[in-house]
Structures are given as C-alpha cells and as structure tokens.
C-alpha cells in the first residue's frame, strides 16, 4: 500500500509525468533487449501502441488508386507521407473497414469446398445438442484419438502425392498415384477446384485436413470418436462433464465402426470353417464396406481392435505389440518372464496344462470400461490397482487379472468341470477355460482369495469380496483408484505371424491374439457391409441363405450345367452349398442327398428327361454326404421362418416358385433371377447316332469357323474342333475324339450334351 501511495504522489507532479512521457530511453541494456533480433519481444504492447497511432498500417502505393483519400464521414484513410525507410504508404485502420465494405468482391463458390471441414464442423455444432452440466470426479485416461473429423484414410505420403497433383500439377517430381482412393479423390478435387483463386498453400493445408487422419494422445472420459473429440474442451473438465449429442456423423467414424463389425463377423465365421485362415482371407478380400474394399481399409486404418488386428495379421500387416486377454489390452511395462508348461489340479481335481510365466512383470491393462496396473511374480499377484466406471466393470478387470496371475487359489476355486468350447466346438485352451468359468460366477474366487487390512493412501480404497468399497480391508493385493491408467501411447507396430487357427504370435512366439478374444457384442453397422463370400450368407438368417444359394446357381448356370453332366462330384463339393446344409433337418440330410443324386443320375442316363428347373431346385440337397436308401420323396423340408417349409420335387411351392411366363424364379417371395433358357424341353430326337465319335463341348464358338453339316464332319482329324449344325438349325461346338474306345457312350451323352449346349 505504501508503495502505491508513493507512486500516486509522484504521478501528481507534472515533472514526473513529463519525464515519463517525453524523455528518451537511453539505457543501452534496455535498448538492446527490445531491438535485437527480428522477434517482437512484447507483441501485445506493440499492437496496442501501434493501433493508437493514426496510420499504423503500411500498404503498397497502388492502394492510393484503389481507395479514396477520405471515407463518407470525411475521415482520412491514408496519409500522403511516405513510410520512413520504404516505398510504401501509411494507412489508417479505417481503410480496412472501407475495403471490407466497398472493396472488390470475388467469387465465394470455392470457399465451402476448400474449407469443407470447417463448414461441416459448424453444421455439426449447429445441430448438436448440449445437455446439462454434471459435477463429478472424471476418470480420464489418455487414449490415442482421432482429432480430425471427416477425413479420408490416406497415409501422409499418399496424401502428399494427391495434394501435389491437385494444387501444383505442373511442379516437377515423380508422383505415382496407385490406390483407387487416391485416383478418385484427385479427380474429384480437380473438378471442384477449377478456377479457384484461394492461395494454393491454403488449399494444400485444407486438403491435408481432409485426407489424413491426425491422432493425439489425449485424456478422455467418454466417447472417443472424432465428433466427440472435436468438442472435448466443451464436454469434460477436471470435475465436470457436459452431455453432448453430435449434430451429424462423419464417414471416418462410420468406417471405423463398420470395420470392427465386419471384422468380428468374419473372424467368428472363419473360426467354424475347415480352414479358418484361408476362409478369413477369402472373406476379407471379397467384402466391401461403404463401397470400398475391406482390404484397402485395413491397410490404411489404424483402428486397434482384436478382430481387426487378426484380419491385419492374416494380410501380413504389422500390428501393435500389446496382447489381448479377457477383452483387456495388456502391455508389459517392465520385467520379463520365461514360459514353462506346468500341470495343475483344479478344485474339481481336473488336470490342466498351463503355460506358466516365470518371473516378475508389470502390465497396464486397458479395457473399454475399466483400466488397471498389475504387478505379478511367478503364479502370484503382487498388486492390482484398478479403476473403472462402475462395480461391474471393476469386477471384470479383477477377474481377468486374477486368472492371468495363474495363482493356485484361483485354480483351486474352480467348482465343477471345465469344458467350454468355441464356435467350432473345439475345447478352449486352459487359460480361457478358467476365464470363462469365473466370468460366469466369481463368487468362490473372490471368497477364497483372501483379504488384508489396508493403509490409508490418498485416492485409493479397498474392495471387498462382494465388490463393495471399504477403507479398512481389501481383497489381497487389490486396490481401487480414482485415477485411470493411460492407454499405451506408442504407435509402434511389429511383424507378427498367424497360424491356420488364427492365433497371432509375435516373433518371440508369445500369443498376442486369438479368436477367443474377439468380442461377441453385436452392433449395427453405419455403412453398408457387402459380404460377397458365400460363407457370410447366413449372417442375415436362413432366408438369406436360401435366396443366395439359388441366386448363385442361376448366376453361374453356364458352368454349373456343364459340371452337372460331366463332373457332378466336384459340383456337389462346392463351398457355396455349405451354408444351405444348416437348413436341412439333420436326420434327413443323407437320405435327401442319396435320393437327389440317384434322380440326377437317371436324368443323365435317360434321354430327354433333363429338367433345368428341377436340377436347380434340388441341387443344393445333393451336397450332403449321401446315404444309400430306396426312399422316394415327393417333397423336401427346409427349416426357415422358424418352421419346416416344403420344396416340392415336382411343382411349385411358396419356397421355390418358377413362373413359366416370365421365366423368373422367386424364392420365399423374393426374386432370385431369370433363367435365360427355355426349361421346358420335353423329348427331342437328336441325331445322337450320327454324333458318335465326337465330344460335344458346348455352344457355338465363332473362332472355329462356319457351321458344318453333319455329313461334312467325317473329314475332321482326331482332336480337331468344329461347329456343327444339328436338328432344328441349332449350332454346337464339337471335337473329334482322340480314342475310339469311348465312342459307345457318345450316343447316350450326345442327347443331353446337345440339349445343354443349345440352352
């Protein structure tokens, strides 16, 4: 107070004021401080001081022709005095106002296109809903999040090439645009930005925002998709949160979400097939997400999720070195261990062979709803510090950590036999057996674990076997913390290998992922997922299997037809008929198959009984291993719509209906396609005898010249092919047989072959 009073007194004297305002600052140190270097030392002061002057701005001389000397209010806009030390004019801030109001205008058409990400953000915020603010402790954990909504997923390099191509097309430098997405984006942007007057550098910056995923490692409680991250500063503080619903979705979040759903479906389906790895690859390569090939998305998208990482590993891509157990991502932060097989006895005296980790190790465990720090020694949990959204989530984390610790009291807590199986009916490995057992019921585990008194440590409390908090005692080694555990921040990726059962290992042989780790959570994808593989037909239920099977036969009828007559066994073994088998009642599969195969054989043997519609209708039933029986059927049952429905062997039914007039097939009322031929063949006396010694190959093929008459055929050499005119002006392609021994069968097959070739 004294000092302030003294200063007041001093300022009241005019001499003081004069000294402070008029005299020069001539202390060398001060002058040096403020004048050395180009860097402004006190920008805020400088700005205030400059703006207090009449003409703080300098401009090019041309401005004098473009702006009047005075505005409508008669205020001077620029001074006739030149700027000292340069050839520029001194200009008033009022000139800027005049220019903004009366200056030349330019086309604004490109602004929304260039600043697309900003315009879209404004729309999202305009339509978003902000709810009430709640004050509570925020358990935030740092996660790697996407901070840039609405981007494509190009790598930095690939985006750079696109930007150069769009903004500086004439610049030198080798640019090769390879991927589908690069080419599409380049074409699109070139059209959008024709005659764009915005500074190229600005356009380049904006394009980068649109093309590249930018991630940051940020503390988050709640939603992690990019439309939530862009308002992170509005929705969560240290002790408060504000509810928010985004006013729009962005494609990159939808891609991430749909990719996870597609990957989970594919891994689940692959697990139950004969060769899981081959099936998984086949499905990844034939699936599209929002019209983009899934394999292209996998190459570019950094999403880390168990199923997605299994698909990446199968494609030979690198993945994160952390491993997954019980739905938690484990990352070893210190220590090391060697692995040794050991046999242990459960509480039910069942013998389990487990791979024991020998040695001291520390891990971080990160799940969707809980996180933890785990310190363990050989088959012993030393300490577990866990934090989570609620009791349930905390319990999940504790169970996983207890099982992972491999402690004896955990193994002894098993009641009953362990015989959990996966989707393919194979027994799970012992660690997952234990996990499933305690996830079902952990009461005995928690009861037998043991409790200990605890010290009062800030931010930590104990937890009792019934999962209620306590400040006195806690489960041995377990504490609950208010603070979350950060996700592993590194984006390092490692080379991994995958076996045919989809177990992913690092180069040291540690299992990082296996299908048991893939979540069973079902969700609805935001983007359309198109699975072209027959293995995924059943994902939409039995009806879809039925329709898809028949559609497939009709689409591929040309080749199916030839295989039906020449190599039926190969046709019956096609994987496209696999899903259909699940619709046929188990007890009847073999009998139906035997019956249909016999029927088909008769068609092949007896002239003129070839019936396209009937072959298509019954073909899927012939795929099961046949039982030899004398059974005859007039209808075959399939299980759809929750009950058995009948397919009539001769004639139409609601399940399989062929309309002769329109030549279209409907399956369960859904259109399954058109038959391009006339299936009503009846019998036709074909010149079978004449065609002995010739093999009918199929339809006319113009490359083999004009059609010969049957008499001209005798001139052909063995193995030579020709088109030949038969019967009612139909032309087929034939080849003269190389051996005479097979001539006998020709007259029988010729009839069928000709009929098929004509059709």
From Swiss-Prot:
Keywords noted in UniProt: Cap snatching, Eukaryotic host gene expression shutoff by virus, Eukaryotic host transcription shutoff by virus, Host gene expression shutoff by virus, Host nucleus, Host-virus interaction, Inhibition of host RNA polymerase II by virus, mRNA capping, mRNA processing, Viral transcription, Virion
Quaternary assembly: Influenza RNA polymerase is composed of three subunits: PB1, PB2 and PA. Interacts (via N-terminus) with PB1 (via C-terminus). Interacts with nucleoprotein NP (via N-terminus).
InterPro entries found in the cross-reference section: Flu_PB2_2nd, Flu_PB2_6th, Flu_PB2_C, Flu_PB2_CAP-bd, Flu_PB2_middle, Flu_PB2_N, INV_PB2, PB2_helical
Family the UniProt entry places it in: Belongs to the influenza viruses PB2 family.
Location, primary (coarse class): virion
UniProt protein name: Polymerase basic protein 2
Gene Ontology biological-process annotations: 7-methylguanosine mRNA capping; cap snatching; DNA-templated transcription; symbiont-mediated suppression of host gene expression; symbiont-mediated suppression of host mRNA transcription via inhibition of RNA polymerase II activity; viral RNA genome replication
Site (Avian adaptation): 627
SUPFAM superfamilies in the cross-refs: PB2 C-terminal domain-like
Lineage of source species: Viruses, Riboviria, Orthornavirae, Negarnaviricota, Polyploviricotina
Gene Ontology CC, one term: virion component
Record keyword Nucleus present: no
Entry keyword Secreted: no
Chain positions of motif Nuclear localization signal: 736-739
GO molecular function: RNA binding; RNA-directed RNA polymerase activity
